């Protein structure tokens, strides 16, 4: 097997694995949002605190997805 083709194949495989971070972040954000909506429906007076915590948690979750996307792009374009 050509070494250059092997490296390209492994880079594509690594990019696919790194892109899985986006799936995990999406699932996590969806679960957190669902639980926040349940919490607000149970206790409407705490909606401000629940929503601020949700926004901070979602930011951290989406940061993981962005890091995975950046790594995948680096592997695809071999920067």
UniProtKB/Swiss-Prot annotation:
Q: How does it sit in the membrane?
A: Multi-pass membrane protein
Site (Reversibly protonated during proton transport) residue list: 62
What's a Pfam family in this record? ATP-synt_C
Bilayer-spanning residue ranges: 7-27, 56-76
Q: Which SUPFAM superfamilies match?
A: F1F0 ATP synthase subunit C
- State a GO cellular component annotated for this protein: proton-transporting two-sector ATPase complex, proton-transporting domain
Query: What keywords tag this UniProt record?
Result: ATP synthesis, Cell membrane, CF(0), Hydrogen ion transport, Ion transport, Lipid-binding, Membrane, Transmembrane, Transmembrane helix, Transport
Where is the protein localized?
A: Cell membrane
Instruction: Give the InterPro entries listed for this entry.
Output: ATP_synth_csu_bac/chlpt, ATP_synth_F0_csu, ATP_synth_F0_csu_DDCD_BS, ATP_synth_F0_csu_sf, ATPase_proteolipid_c-like_dom, F/V-ATP_Csub_sf
Biological process terms from the Gene Ontology for this record are:
proton motive force-driven ATP synthesis
Query: Which terms does the record give in the GO molecular function aspect?
Result: lipid binding; proton-transporting ATP synthase activity, rotational mechanism
Q: What is its main location?
A: membrane
Q: What is known about its subunit structure?
A: F-type ATPases have 2 components, F(1) - the catalytic core - and F(0) - the membrane proton channel. F(1) has five subunits: alpha(3), beta(3), gamma(1), delta(1), epsilon(1). F(0) has three main subunits: a(1), b(2) and c(10-14). The alpha and beta chains form an alternating ring which encloses part of the gamma chain. F(1) is attached to F(0) by a central stalk formed by the gamma and epsilon chains, while a peripheral stalk is formed by the delta and b chains.
Q: Give the matching HAMAP family.
A: ATP_synth_c_bact (MF_01396)
The role this protein plays is: F(1)F(0) ATP synthase produces ATP from ADP in the presence of a proton or sodium gradient. F-type ATPases consist of two structural domains, F(1) containing the extramembraneous catalytic core and F(0) containing the membrane proton channel, linked together by a central stalk and a peripheral stalk. During catalysis, ATP synthesis in the catalytic domain of F(1) is coupled via a rotary mechanism of the central stalk subunits to proton translocation. Key component of the F(0) channel; it plays a direct role in translocation across the membrane. A homomeric c-ring of between 10-14 subunits forms the central stalk rotor element with the F(1) delta and epsilon subunits.
Similarity section? Belongs to the ATPase C chain family.
The protein, known as: ATP synthase subunit c
């Amino acid at each position: 097997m050509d070494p250059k083709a092997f490296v390209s194949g492994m880079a594509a495989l690594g990019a696919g694995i790194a892109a899985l971070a986006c799936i995990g972040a999406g699932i996590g954000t969806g679960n957190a949002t669902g639980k926040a909506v349940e919490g607000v429906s149970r206790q409407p007076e705490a909606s401000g605190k629940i929503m601020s915590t949700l926004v901070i948690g979602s930011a951290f979750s989406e940061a993981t997805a962005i890091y995975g996307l950046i790594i995948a792009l680096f592997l695809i374009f071999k920067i």
